[in-house]
Amino acid sequence: MRSFASDNNSGVHPLVMEALNRANIDHSLGYGDDKWTEEAVAKIKETFTPNCVPLFVFNGTGSNVVALQLMTRPYHSIFCAETAHIYVDECGSPVKMTGCQIRPIATPDGKLTPELMQSYLHGFGDQHHSQPRALYISQ
C-alpha cells in the first residue's frame, strides 16, 4: 500500500540508499563533524546562498518545529486551517517546543483566505493576547 501521509511511510530513492551504503563503509565523527555533512552544507550554500545556515533534522515534525521556533517567540500565535498537519498530526510538538498558541481556523476546504482570518487578527500590542506572528499553509 502506498501512502503519502508522512515521509516516514516509504523507503528511500535508490540513489539515496546507494549514498547511505557508501557512507556506511568507514567510521566518521558524528554531530556534523564529518565529510558527508560538510559536503551537504557546501551544496546547500551553493544552491541557496553562502550565508545560509543549514539545520539538519530527521523528520518533518522536526523541520516544522525548527522553522516555527526561528519565526516565533512564546508570546506569539500561529494560524492554520483546522485541518493543518501541525494542528492535527504532530501531537502537540509545535506547541510544546515553541510555547506558541496554535489558532486553528475553520475552513470549508482547508484553504485560508483573508476573509476567514480577519476575525482572528486582533490584540496587536495587547499584553493579554498572544501576538499573531505566523501563518502555516499546507497542501
Can you describe what each PLM-predicted range is?
Residues 2-3, 52-56, 76-78, 101-103, ...:
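Structural motif
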Residues 97-139:
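PLP-dependent aminotransferase-class I/II
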Residues 70-88:
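Conserved PLP-anchoring active-site segment centered on the Schiff-base-forming lysine
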Residues 1-19:
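N-terminal amphipathic/basic leader segments beginning at the initiator methionine
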Residues 53-72, 105-107:
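Conserved core of the PLP fold type I
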Residues 6, 50, 54, 109-110, ...:
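Structured catalytic cores of enzymes that bind and process phosphorylated ligands/cofactors
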Residues 13-60, 82-83, 87-88, 93:
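Conserved N-terminal alpha-helix of the aminotransferase class I/II PLP-enzyme fold
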